[in-house]
């Protein structure tokens, strides 16, 4: 058995309905689209959220909130990902070199997810309480 020889079991898939192919099919002539109107035409239909000219719900409701521009350049680094970094000192440049964070990241925060076995020194990164405890338990330290 090979991937290119796989096929569904006989009778498992029914043939698709072919519309507009005669009266006997039950979907001839108008092909299940009814008579006239925008939805019967080729390419006919309205965009999602359109309410026939009535002011749409999206616009009736007020705007709220914003996206912090700092969040665009901030990354969350899991404790387990610190193992990918070579060397004992882990800073933002070390994370970028190890491809843990992308080049446009300016701030990073280490969170407790996964484990770290070797002692490391975390420099210039924010660290959560749980991650701080785990790093110090492994014999590492955090430098602000």
Swiss-Prot record:
- Supply one GO molecular-function term: structural constituent of ribosome
This protein's UniProt keywords: Ribonucleoprotein, Ribosomal protein, RNA-binding, rRNA-binding
Q: Name one GO biological process term.
A: translation
Q: Segment Disordered: which positions?
A: 1-53
Compositional bias, Gly residues, is annotated for 21-31, 42-52
**NCBIfam families given in the database record:** rplO_bact
Quaternary structure and interacting proteins, as annotated: Part of the 50S ribosomal subunit.
Reported function: Binds to the 23S rRNA.
Q: Which family does it belong to?
A: Belongs to the universal ribosomal protein uL15 family.
What name has this protein been given in UniProt? Large ribosomal subunit protein uL15
What gene is behind this protein?
Answer: rplO
């Amino acid at each position: 058995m090979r991937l290119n020889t796989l096929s569904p079991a006989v009778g498992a898939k029914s043939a698709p309905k072919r519309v507009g192919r005669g009266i006997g099919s039950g979907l001839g002539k108008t092909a299940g689209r009814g008579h006239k109107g925008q939805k019967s035409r080729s390419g006919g239909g309205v965009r999602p959220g359109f309410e026939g000219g009535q002011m749409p719900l999206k616009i009736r409701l007020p705007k709220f909130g914003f996206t912090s521009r700092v969040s665009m350049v901030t990354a969350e680094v899991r404790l387990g990902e610190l193992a990918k970094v070579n060397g004992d000192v882990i800073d933002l440049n070390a994370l970028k070199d190890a491809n843990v964070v992308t080049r446009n990241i300016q701030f990073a925060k280490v969170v407790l997810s996964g484990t770290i076995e070797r002692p490391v020194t975390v420099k210039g990164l924010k660290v959560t309480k749980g991650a701080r405890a785990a790093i110090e338990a492994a014999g590492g330290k955090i430098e602000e």
